[in-house]
Amino acid sequence: MSALSSIDFSGFQRQGFQRLEACISQSQLNVLRQVAQAFHVNWERDNLDFYQSRAVNSAYLTAPDYLDNTQRELLFQFIGSQLIKDVISPLFADCCGFLNTQLFFNPVNPDQRNYWHRDCQYHLSLAQQQAALTGPLGLHLRLALYDEPGLEFIPGSHKRWDTEMQLDVRLSQAGHTPSDELPGGMLVPLQAGDMLLFDANMIHRGLYGMDRLALDILFCDPVPELLQFAREDCLPDTRTLESLVWPDAFTVTANMLKNCGNN
């Protein structure tokens, strides 16, 4: 067990998010910073126009595209560690699958505005988005690699549909824009080494500024409608899998992709 094995997660269940302070050692933080920065440099080189025009995040860090095998191994060992198991397992009724990794950073344009959203709005209709609030869980585990402004949430929106204003803002309707202020928002700043758990379906927005560089690890209930977005090349090989303290989330995803024929 890790130091996080006895945490009360009632705050997450009630609000849809929960911050865990000072979760990892400075030495482990330094290792993850180096891996994330190496990925970012290589990813930026191949996505320069996108990065300079509007990007605020990248994805698929554990794929072989931008990291070498040693760097990928470091990420797999962290994701499959006792620490991550102790944080993630209590939030799922049975088991969970590994979905993806993302890296969040500041936009190049200092005038670029942040935006309220639910993650599911980019692939579901409004009716499907509303139904998703009682459906499978998609979970972000964010690790702040440096001090950052964090995120802003509408507490409880992981279980509650939008008010008229919230819907107008996040969908740019009725003269609103997704960067407009919303009443009831809760700011959650992060310090380096903090973790932040939040439901992907809740209304939230990232806050830009400072030295924002955050590693997100996404987990979900083991259902095809969510794991269809996972990629086989982002999973560890058999040798690495057998070395992990907690290989379960990777194994669940590998089996689901195999059964669905998704390569």
Please describe what each predicted stretch is.
Residues 10, 134, 138, 144-203:
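Double-stranded beta-helix
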Residues 120-129, 173-175, 181:
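Active-site glycine-rich loop that binds ribose-phosphate moieties when present
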Residues 111-118, 125-128, 150-157, 162-166, ...:
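A short secondary-structure junction signal
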Residues 2-14, 21-127:
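Non-heme Fe(II)-dependent double-stranded beta-helix
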Residues 106, 158-161, 219-225:
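Short edge-strand/loop segments of extracellular domains
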Residues 101-103, 141-143, 215-219:
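A structural signal for short, well-ordered beta-strand segments
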